[in-house]
C-alpha cells in the first residue's frame, strides 16, 4: 500500500466506490438513509450470541468454577481537568465556602467515555482496540472497578455479570486485572513470587502443600519452568526475566485462583512480535478453558488479529464496532471504508479511527459517522435490548465466604514477613552495600580520632567523634530506608488495593524483617570505632554506647519510614528528608548548648533524637571520670577538672540517662505509628 493510498485512507477517502458514502458531505441524507436501511434490514455485523460452552477444565485453586458473561451499558465516564494552580484554587474556594455564602461552582470535567456498551462471553477473547487516547484503559479500569482518583463513572452506567448488577467487592472475587505496568519485588525469583501470591490469594482453607501444587501447575501451564528460579530483576538496574517472561508471570499471579474473568491492559506493550504472539496465545488458551478474557491492544499484527474472537473498536471515547474480525471487514466496507487487499485490518481500523494532526475536524467528523452508524445497527439495538431487560443466563454463585481477604491475618503477616526477609537478604543495596559502607566509615572515623587521650584537646575530639556517631547513623539509615521502602510502595499500593493483605500486616512484617539489619549495622559500627577512638573502657560502657547507637539507628529508620509514607515519590522523600533532619540536629547539644535553646523552640528540642542520644553517650563517657584523670597540658586554656564539669558545661545531668533511653524509645514508637497512619491514609486514598 503506497503512501498516497495511506494518506487517502487516513483522510477518510478510498479507492473503492463505496467510500463515497462515508466522506461525501454533499450526499448527506441519501447516503445516511442507505446506510441506515442496510443496517436496519439486512445487515447484522457483529453478533451477541455467545460461543459454544467450553468444557469444564477444573481446578484445585478453590475458586468458583462458573462461566461469566460480562456486559456493560451506558458507561459515561468523566475526568477532572487539570488547570494551572488548580490545587491552590481549590484550597481558596473551600476556604471561601466556609466563611462566605457563595454559590459553589463545580470543577470542569472532561467527558472521557460516551455511552459505551459491550458484552464479553465465556470462552471468547475480546480485544479492545483503538488509537492512543481512544479510552481503552479508561474503559478497562471502569470494568475492573479500578478507576483512579479524579475519574468518575456515571451512576447510570451498568456493569452486569450474568445479567446481574455487580459491585466492586463481587468483581474482586471473580475478576483478575493485569495492568499494563508489571510491578514486582525484583530480588525475588519467579517461583518465590508465585508462592507468596498463593499464600495471600488462595482461600484460607487450603494447606501449604495444596498452594505449592497449584503454583507448580500454573508454572507448567504458562511455560515458566525454565525461569522459575531466575530473579525477576529490575529493568535497567538488575538483570532478570525478559519482558515476555515478566508478562507471563503477571498472568500466573492472577491465574493462581483460576478466576472466570480476566482483564488485561496492554499485555503486549513493549514486547517484540514473537513475544507478543506468545503472550496472546497464553490468553487464548485461557479463554478456551471457559474464561472470559478482555484485553486492550494498540496495533496487533495480522497473526495476532486472527487470534481474537471478537474486537471492540473505540474512537474518541465511543464504540465504533463490536463483533468478530470478519464482521468488522464487512462493516467498514459497508460504511465506505473498505480495507484494501493484503493489508492488515488492525492497522487499517486504527488509521481510519485516528485523529490526524492538522485534519482534526475532518477526522472527528469521520469518526462520528462511523460511531453513529454502529449505534443504529441491529447489533447495537440488540445489545441495548439485552442489557435493558437484564436477562439472566446463569445466576451468580455465591462466594465461599464473606471474608474481605482470602488469607487470615496471621497468614498475611507470615507471607509478608517471609517475602520481606527474602528481599532483605537478596537486596544488595540494603545488605552488602550497607555493611561495606558502615565498615569503611567506622574505620575512617577510627583513624581520624585514633587513640584519643583525656586532655583538653582530647575532650573536644571525643565529643566531636560521639556526635559523628549520631549523624552517621541518622543519615545512613534515613536515606537507605527511603531508597528501599519507597521503591516497594507501588507494589504495596497495588496489592493492597487488590485486597491481598492488610496495611498493618504489611507494615509490621516489613519492619520486623528489616530489624536484624538495623541491629547489625550499629553493632558493626560501634565494635570498630569505639576501641579505635579510645572511648571509656569497660564492658558496661561499651554496651551502653551500643544500646544508644542502636536506638538512634532505629529512630532514624522510623523517621525514614515516616518520610517515605508521607511522600509521593522517592525524589520527593529524598528532598524533604534533609531539611527536616537539620533542625533536630541543631538541638543535639553539639552546635547549640542545651541551655541556650529559645523558649519558643524548646518543644522542638524534645523531638530531637540527637539531644537524647548525645546526652546519653556523653553521660556514658564522662559521668564517672574523677578529678585528676583529665590531663591539663595547656595553661592558657580552660581545662575541665572532671567529667561532671564537662556535663555541667553542656547543661547535661547524669541523672537523665534513663530519661534519654525512654525518650528514644518513645520516638521510635511515635514515628512508626505516624508512618503507619500515613501509609494507611495513602492506601485509602487509592481505594
Swiss-Prot record:
Q: Give the EC number.
A: 7.6.2.-, 7.6.2.6
Glycosylated residues (UniProt): 636
Q: Which residues lie on this side of the membrane: Cytoplasmic?
A: 1-419, 482-497, 553-568, 666-675
Membrane topology for this entry?
Multi-pass membrane protein
Q: List the catalytic activities from the record.
A: 3',5'-cyclic GMP(in) + ATP + H2O = 3',5'-cyclic GMP(out) + ADP + phosphate + H(+); guanine(out) + ATP + H2O = guanine(in) + ADP + phosphate + H(+); riboflavin(in) + ATP + H2O = riboflavin(out) + ADP + phosphate + H(+); (6S)-5,6,7,8-tetrahydrofolate(out) + ATP + H2O = (6S)-5,6,7,8-tetrahydrofolate(in) + ADP + phosphate + H(+)
**Any one GO molecular function term:** riboflavin transmembrane transporter activity
UniProt keyword annotations, A-Z: ATP-binding, Cytoplasmic vesicle, Glycoprotein, Membrane, Nucleotide-binding, Pigment, Translocase, Transmembrane, Transmembrane helix, Transport
Q: Outline the segment boundaries, as ranges, of region: Disordered.
A: 1-30
Q: What class of enzyme is it?
A: translocase
Domain ABC transporter stretches: 93-341
Quaternary organization: May form a heterodimer with bw/brown. May form a heterodimer with st/scarlet.
How is this protein named in the record?
Answer: Protein white
Q: Which organism is it from?
A: Drosophila melanogaster (Fruit fly)
